């Protein structure tokens, strides 16, 4: 629930619209939470919905080129890896130790590390255990390729952004206006080989 005192919007609305700025910050926080849920939610999160046949463990602990090759070999058209930034750093160290050099590629205008031409995208929502281990995801995406897809309602009342709406709740006797900001999201793995997980990736203690 976003609460904004009317005095704030009356007195401090220049040079920036205070309601719009507060709403922007609220939406950003919701999107961060949404990303966390898509990875970690026990019902629909990707970490909990990988088929056991497509869950691998590292050969020696740290994420090696051979480990990522194993992940790639389990599915066609892998679109990207998803890894914690510290796991990406650990993979870079292993590449150096094995005297191999990963590629780079451009995703949304930013240059990122890649392996066999597949981007390795950073995601700090992937958990790190107390023992200093994490997981790396590999996935094929899109309905046409029977991959991992995101789900959201097609239309929402008072829609502000796709899958997100803002509903006016009223004004209190203290002149505080309330808005209910809600995000609706889920994910689905259309066929088991669309998602693979490399577990027990050692990156050192957090």
Residue map of PLM features:
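Extended, solvent-exposed, turn-rich assembly/linker loops in the middle of proteins
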Residues: 50-113
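Residue-level recognition of well-ordered secondary-structure positions
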Residues: 24-28, 82, 180
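Alpha-helical scaffold segments that mediate packing/assembly in large oligomeric complexes
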Residues: 2-77
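Sequence/fold signature of self-assembling virion shell proteins
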Residues: 103-206
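A broad, low-specificity signal for short, low-complexity segments enriched in glycine/proline
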Residues: 38-45, 82, 95-100, 138-143
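Generic secondary-structure boundary/loop-capping signal
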Residues: 1, 5-8, 35, 43-44, ...
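Short loop/turn segments at secondary-structure transitions that flank enzyme active sites
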Residues: 8, 32, 87-89, 126, ...
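Amphipathic, alpha-helical segments enriched in basic
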Residues: 1, 5, 95, 154-158
């Amino acid at each position: 629930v976003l609460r904004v005192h009317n005095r704030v919007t009356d007195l401090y609305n220049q040079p920036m619209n205070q309601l719009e700025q507060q709403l922007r910050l609220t939406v950003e926080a919701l999107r961060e939470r949404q990303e966390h849920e898509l990875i970690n939610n026990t019902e629909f999160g990707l970490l909990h919905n990988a088929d056991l046949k497509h869950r691998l463990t590292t050969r020696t602990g740290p994420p090696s080129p051979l480990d990522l090759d194993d992940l790639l070999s389990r599915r066609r058209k892998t679109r990207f890896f998803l890894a914690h930034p510290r796991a990406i750093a650990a993979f870079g160290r292993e590449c150096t130790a094995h005297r191999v050099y990963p590629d780079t590629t451009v995703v949304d205008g930013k240059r990122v590390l890649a392996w066999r031409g597949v981007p390795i995208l950073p995601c700090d929502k992937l958990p790190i255990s107390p023992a200093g281990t994490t997981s790396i995801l590999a996935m094929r995406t899109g309905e046409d390729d029977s991959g991992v897809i995101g789900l959201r309602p097609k239309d929402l009342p008072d829609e502000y952004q796709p899958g997100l709406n803002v509903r006016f709740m009223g004004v209190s006797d203290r002149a505080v206006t309330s808005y209910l900001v809600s995000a609706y999201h889920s994910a689905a793995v259309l066929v088991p080989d669309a998602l693979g997980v490399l577990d027990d990736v050692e990156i050192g203690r957090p």
